[in-house]
Amino acid sequence: MAEINQVDLEQLLNCALCPNLCRCDCPVLQVTGREAVAPAGKARLAAQVQQDFMVWNSELLEAVSNCLGCRNCTVLCPFPDLNLCDELLYSRTGEKKAGFSLPSWEPYLNNLKRYGSPYGQKTAGQAVKVAKEAEVVYYAGCTTLANNPGTLDAAQQLLEKAGVSYTLINEDCCGYPAETWGDLELAGKLAAENCRKIAESGAKVLVTGCPECWQTFSERYPYWGHEFPVK
């Protein structure tokens, strides 16, 4: 595996020059109708920058950032080792380090740094410990806490009716939004905090109702070098 956060130009070119069957499965392309944000379109733009044929600007960054990370493009991809979503993430991380960032990202990144949630203070501290130690820790996720807190209440009721010993933690965002906005260092800090708090809870199993958080815990944390302390 290439060094984390290192763009693989060969893989970008493989995608850029492919017949692009994946374009049929890209939800961003289906909604926008813009070839520039099709999987191969984004790969072409990123490859051009990597070869110094183009330089980053807000228009290019906006196009390359139009990726949901759904990985639908991998289903029909003829290159088994190509993960375009990761290559685009690496590109955005490189852009951020070079000082390029979309203004719309900055308020959310600042909220993550200050409150541990992209939504700001209104979600900070909403999930607090209800038991010192338990077999199960329930992780609500910052989007749930901000937009649908009733999901947390319902999950607690289910766990209690099932007789499950559970706890909540004063959770931070899982870190995936920070990665998608190019700040891998911040994503790693959030991951480290969550791993510490979960380990301190004494739980052996983590349950979450957020699919994005589940994917981040199961796939991104190991990739970032964090050993997740529970199943």
What do these predicted ranges mean?
Residues 1-64:
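Ferredoxin-type iron-sulfur electron-transfer modules and their immediate structural context
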Residues 227-231:
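Short, intrinsically disordered, charge-balanced linker/junction segments flanking boundaries
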Residues 43-226:
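Iron-sulfur-cluster electron-transfer modules
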